[in-house]
Amino acid sequence: MSVFASEDRSPSISARRRVHHAVIGLATLLACGGSPEYDVVIRNGTLYDGSGRAPVAGDLAIAGDSIVAVGTVAGRGRLEVDATGYAVSPGFINMLSWANESLLEDGRSMSDIMQGVTLEVMGEGESMGPLSDTLRADMRAQQGDIRYPITWRTLRGYLDSLVARGVSTNVASFIGATTVRINHIGWDDRAPTAAELAAMQAEVRQAMEEGARGVGSSLIYAPAFYAKTPELVALMQAAAPYGGMYISHLRSEGARLEEAVDELMTIARETGARAEIYHLKAAGEANWPKMARVLARIDSARAAGLEITADIYPYTAGATGLDAAMPPWVQEGGYAAWAKRLQDPAVRRKVAEEMRTPTDQWESLLLASGSPDRVVLSGFKADSLKPYTGKTLAAVAALRGTSVEETAMDLVIKDGSRVGTIYFIIDEDNIAAQLRKPWVSVGSDAGSLASEGVFLKSSPHPRAYGSFARVLGKYVRDDTVLTLEEGVRRMTSLPAANLRLARRGTLAPGSFADIVIFNPATIRDNATFEQPHQYASGVRDVFVNGVQVVRNGEHTGAKPGRVVLGPGARR
């Protein structure tokens, strides 16, 4: 069997025939008084099919990698699973995964699979391919606690390598607009030449034919910040004929949030592509009132025919690096050039002044946080700096006896990285308002980690361990922002439809058997900012492509994950 899953807009003819034959076979056997055999039968569960409709009590049968019967199943399963008192739903889809490196270290995908995530979708601005020689060398140099050989050149090569190593979840990726830009322009703050842009478009087309899901951008950071709207339109003009989606970390989530949303809509309108906003938020208390206008703006665009969606992580803090506290101009040329400039006294004075001064020319998450006491340092490469892990920027500045701005610059230089950083910038009421919109799905914006080994060297955002369980526990059960059936839809059929995944995201005959069995009364996130390495609770069993990966709350060791190819893939 191929490790690649065909993801056409509708089930393939062969898939429909298999289901048709299974139904005929079931009817024949029942008429004859016999019982068909299945690989797995899940019995007496409360079935949430992903559609948002009210649940029904029933059974579900699996043969091979697919669901073949839903309702009352008379036949026996080689494995019989009693789901009495439990919810049974499609596997959850992580629309914004940074499991790129963590899956190379540990293919079990523990922090996500223990929440019921069965598909990791990567590619926010940066993707693991295609790689120029320069970018490949940079990736090697920037590796931190997780070390790995780079044996691939293309995005497809990377995804293939994951499956060859073994992964418990399915995997997919957008091609990163930042990756494409670095391959052809480097870190220069300029527009591409006509020849460079043509080469960039060709690279996008190749990635789409290899199975990319579209183009992902991350416009707050250098060098993506240097790309103007026409460049992004050109990349999407290359991806759109393949059914590609444009998905973006907006150019601004603060002072110019509304203008940034307009830019995304312009790209969608000019290319005819659907578009999604990564981790929609209004960053910084001064900008929180803008969210109501943004939501209304998106509703209006959708009513006018644009297919605009968004995803969120359900926490009041974001996580990125100290680069988000410094102006983009100082970062031109990449990390080495950035660190060198930060050692020039005149440059340091200018950067420090700009770090302290509000502006709408670039996005400062340090200023959006309101105070360095609301900025937490979460990950270092250098062992000498690891004792600062989990401390606030204000506390570290006090320990070092330097200003907040000087401390941030010194840490970037000494660590050899942008330094993992958590910023408290998001309004709780806005999270609830966003979740009430039927076009909002969920993404962790984090790696898929484990509470052991190399992962314990960092103090990650708890969203890595809790985003999906938090939606079902806090926002569904406790706060009643969503019904359970709607909460399930947001994490299953909605992202599947946005990604054009015809056979995932639903409990229906012919769908791949990505299935979660969980207790609605007990599911919850346990990870905190103080103690992030804690798995969610309440998920009992998880199946991926018909194989049981979690049994009674314990990982089975199985790694049946596949590459989920985009709609333009040529096999």
Spans of features found by a protein language model:
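C-terminal motif of bacterial Sec signal peptides marking the signal peptidase cleavage site
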Residues: L30-A31
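Active-site neighborhoods of metal-dependent hydrolases
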Residues: L159-L162, V167-A194, A198-Y221, L232, ...
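Bacterial N-terminal signal peptides that target proteins for export
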Residues: V3-V23
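Divalent-metal coordination cores built from histidine and acidic residues
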Residues: Y86-V88, F92-I93, S97, L103-G214, ...
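Alpha-helix-loop-beta-strand connector modules within alpha/beta enzyme cores
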Residues: V233-G244, S248
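C-terminal cap of metal-dependent C-N hydrolases
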Residues: G45, D344, A433-W439, D445, ...
